[in-house]
Amino acid sequence: MERVYYRYIFRLKSPLALGSGISDNTDSDVLLDSRGVPYIPATSIAGVIRHSVDEDTARELFGTIQNGSGEMSKVLTYDAVCTGENAVSVRDSVRLNNKVADDTGKFDFEAVETGAEFRGYIELADCGADGDSVINEAFQKINAGLLRFGHKTTRGYGTVAVEGLQRIGFSDADDWLDFDMFDDECWKNAQAVELTKPSDLTGITLSLKQRGGISIRRYSTDVSDGENAAPDYEQLSLRSGVPVIPGTSWAGAFRARFCEFAGEEKADGLFGHIEENVKQARNKKSAIYFSESMLDGGYYKTVTRNSIDRFTSGTNDGALYTEKTYYGGSTELELLFTEKQSDDVKRAVLAVIADLDNGFLSVGGLTSVGRGLFSVEKLCINGQDMTESFRNYDFDKLLEVW
């Protein structure tokens, strides 16, 4: 007999939107256990790991069901339960088409905020070296952001960092029976597992600097204290107050501009698409992953202004509103590519980034009055600093390392 156990911690690098199917608080409430604690179900973890291997290996390790009979999985996965403090926040979203909201496109959902930690366990039963290889490869991809949890995974949600990965194995039945994987004392002699980056990882990292304010709105119901006006809406932020730009905002802006450069067909191939009202729809998942960006180094500013009638140049009745926005911050945006792309597609992506740097592409709302502008301070492709080539618009040089 052979039993191998892995213990790990998933620390959220971006919000986790894992729906429970319940819509008591929002359109999609986060999954909670009986104590009200968020967790990642074992089925989700097993599904993500299984998806990372080829079909033959999947059948060998994860079991099969055929014609009413089958084999049990050799990989036993346990729920990863949130430890310590956690914060569940509500995200408001709206489906846009060329900056215009679609009818019935407003929705909200709950998400576990960035920084929460989840502890989980995996047991391998007589898997041999193949089992260790599969777990190591899967956790490398999870740690690199190629495998994520929940929904909206290509748009910045469900990214985790793998921390404290440990392995312990048993070939003696008595030693195995004495082992309790939930007891910290039993892991004292466990082996620490180091993870490396996948060799096939293709990514672009942008270091960005704000050129003005940002307006990705979260509407507020706070009441004024009599001295300071409570904002009608404010920049989207974490519970800790850190302002964020969700991957959905980046993806929408990038896709719209990419479509202008490369056309709808290539945009569907890179950003994915869904065929609605079609019986045999050929839907495609996005081949580009956007990160969620956290802003820092700037400051909040509360602005009160009027809406002006374009004909009379006078103020509109009831159109005084207050906004809390964020200025002068810096952030990073990471783009990961899961498929090889043609040079035409790569050039179009680089052209979109150039537009962002030159102020021709903005993110969020109120873009017509100067919000959402950024400059590219640094550009790295696959870990190599290519800022100078980008400044010279030497796309041929950039493609050499992509």
Task: Give, region by region, the residue ranges found by the protein language model.
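Small/polar/charged residue-enriched interaction surfaces, especially the RNA/DNA-contacting tracks
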Residues: 1-402
